[in-house]
């Protein structure tokens, strides 16, 4: 067992500690059981970190199991994507990936056992009729007219279902529990239904498929899971989980434990809503960097360490709440501040001509890759007569608080010289096209010899060697913290969630690798996007800004000011 002093404490770990201390379990065995009907999001990451993390901390094991009981919505592409996401987060499952479909033969046998015990029956009622007979939270359900069919007849009917003798929607196997139960999931739930659908693992072997609630508990038991961790919406279903295992011949009975799901502000995690966003071209796909899918976060430049740290910081409780986006952003900002090499980029360029710098000359200047980590080394950047700076870094006149370049005043260029702005050239609309300056040749790496103070520092790139680049600057996808609660969700989309800028980067970035993280000095953290490979040009995604620009906005929304 891992050092308990180094582990975060929560109610789940307290349960596990008690189980191990009492001898109820000798080891810990968890699982991550996604349904392969979509891509994983940050909420799944919380479950991954919890299940795999607990297994690691207790020297136990964690299975990856695909709950593939609904072939209508499942695809091999989703299976492969889920495997990739789990591995990207840094986790390795026990043995080969499992599939609930691996257990279809056993599941079918357990269904027959329930029939033989008089605890399941085939219902020929329509789906609408079954829904009507189910009752409401305030009214008990009504027994199906097929509820008291004999065991022999039910065995024959279920065999006919299995043999494909009933059409879809005309017959279903239901557990016989209690139609007056205050818990809707216990009112004779369907545990098998007819589906004439090709399955991505079992092919056309089956035309009856078990329901999730019947499959999940049995799969856990067959795999010897000790602690079955799931989100709070399955709390009532725990009664069905236990009922199934209590009424079949199986030795293992895992303990289901529920925890709160992750609700992240300014985004959505519903597969239905995200699919609509994709279909209506509101986002580019499930890996759009504005979506909190694991693929989207990875494309945006989030690291596995930052996602795992986020999941640790939010903790595990039984209380549903909204987690601020700024907490996720703080995790990647903290990570990249330490680990991302620095580089220079200009996103809204205006040209500077240094008139006293020799024409045609260039020099290579040393620039540290990280100001606080000498072990990250340095790189060489080209300095030349013509350079690009950010348009917002120049003013014709400004007050003393503006510590950048002002006409007739000086500023230092990062890792280079002090320059002074002498005059400007504008176009017919008054837009500044060129700033003419002169430089102090004796200020490379040192202060001016006469002791004058130059307070501001700005970044730049050589106009002669810089590479053209596209910058995709991302913001919150929605303008409200909880868009799913809005009546017209799409009206709350942020029209400025993606702003595309054209500019330049230092020449060294021509060799940047896909997904490689950088801090563009004074601008933010960026990574090379996958479109750079397909389009043959430099495209960088903003991962996160240097500072939390939304903190004040969120505070105002909280206080109502």
From Swiss-Prot:
Cellular component per GO, a single term: cytosol
PROSITE patterns: AA_TRNA_LIGASE_I
Family membership noted in the UniProt record: Belongs to the class-I aminoacyl-tRNA synthetase family.
Organism expressing this protein natively: Idiomarina loihiensis (strain ATCC BAA-735 / DSM 15497 / L2-TR)
Top-rank taxon: Bacteria
This enzyme's EC code(s): 6.1.1.18
GO molecular function terms listed in the Swiss-Prot or TrEMBL record: ATP binding; glutamine-tRNA ligase activity
Subcellular location, record wording: Cytoplasm
Reactions mediated catalytically: tRNA(Gln) + L-glutamine + ATP = L-glutaminyl-tRNA(Gln) + AMP + diphosphate
EC main group: ligase
Span of the annotated motif 'HIGH' region: 34-44
Subunit and interaction comment: Monomer.
Chain positions of motif 'KMSKS' region: 268-272
Binding-site positions, ATP: 35-37, 41-47, 231, 261-262, 269-271
Keyword ATP-binding in record: yes
UniProt keyword list: Aminoacyl-tRNA synthetase, ATP-binding, Cytoplasm, Ligase, Nucleotide-binding, Protein biosynthesis
GO terms classed as biological process: glutaminyl-tRNA aminoacylation; glutamyl-tRNA aminoacylation
Protein name per its UniProtKB record: Glutamine--tRNA ligase
Gene3D superfamilies per the UniProt record, alphabetical: HUPs, Ribosomal Protein L25, Chain P
Keyword DNA damage among record annotations: no
Binding-site list for L-glutamine: 67, 212
